[in-house]
C-alpha cells in the first residue's frame, strides 16, 4: 500500500489495495495527527503514488497494470498509462471478486495477469510535465514512457 503526504493541501493519501480505494486524511503537519478520513477515489488495487506537476495524484494499480491520475480536489480519475491485456483483465476481475469476498488471490498471480509488462506494475517516477515518466514492476524492470 502506498501513501503520499501533500504539504500544500495538508493531506495524507493512503492506498488500500485490498479495498480498491484511496483514502484522504486531513494532516496536521506539526503534530502528525490525522482527521476527517474520506474515500478520495475507488480504483482497482491502488499501490504507490506520487503527485505530478499539475497537483494530480498518479497511482500505480498492479492488478490492472495501469497508472491512474486522481484529482485530489474532487476524486475524478482516469487512466494515464495502460499495459493491461484481455487475459489480464479477466484475471483482475476474478481477483477483485475474491477480495470483495475476503478470499485470497495469490494463485491468480500468473504471467497472464501481468499482461505485456514484465511483472506487476507497482510504482512510478514522474518529473515535470515535459519529461518522460517511468513505471516500475514488482521485480527489477523500469520502463521509460515518453509523453509524446
Predicted regions and their residues:
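Beta-rich, blade/repeat-based domains predominating
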Residues: 1-11, 39-58, 64, 90-92, ...
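Short coil turn/linker residues within repeat-based beta-strand modules
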Residues: 9, 19, 29-34, 64, ...
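Eukaryotic tandem repeat interaction scaffolds
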Residues: 17-45, 53
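Structural signal for beta-propeller blades
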Residues: 20-22, 65-68, 141-143
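Beta-propeller fold detector
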Residues: 33-42, 77-93
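C-terminal/domain-terminus segments
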Residues: 132-148
Amino acid at each position: 500500500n502506498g501513501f503520499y503526504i501533500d504539504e500544500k493541501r495538508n493531506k495524507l493519501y493512503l492506498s488500500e489495495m485490498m479495498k480498491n480505494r484511496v483514502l484522504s486524511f486531513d494532516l496536521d503537519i506539526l503534530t502528525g495527527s490525522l482527521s476527517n478520513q474520506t474515500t478520495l477515489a475507488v480504483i482497482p488495487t491502488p499501490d504507490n503514488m506520487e503527485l505530478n506537476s499539475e497537483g494530480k495524484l498518479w497511482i500505480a494499480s498492479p492488478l490492472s497494470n495501469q497508472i491512474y491520475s486522481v484529482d485530489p480536489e474532487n476524486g475524478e480519475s482516469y487512466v494515464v498509462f495502460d499495459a493491461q491485456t484481455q487475459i489480464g483483465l479477466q484475471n483482475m476481475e476474478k481477483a477483485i471478486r475474491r477480495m470483495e469476498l475476503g478470499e485470497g488471490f495469490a494463485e491468480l498471480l500468473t504471467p497472464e495477469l501481468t499482461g505485456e509488462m514484465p511483472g506487476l506494475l507497482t510504482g512510478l517516477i514522474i518529473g515535470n510535465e515535459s519529461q518522460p515518466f517511468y513505471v516500475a514492476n514488482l521485480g527489477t524492470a523500469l520502463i521509460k514512457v515518453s509523453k509524446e
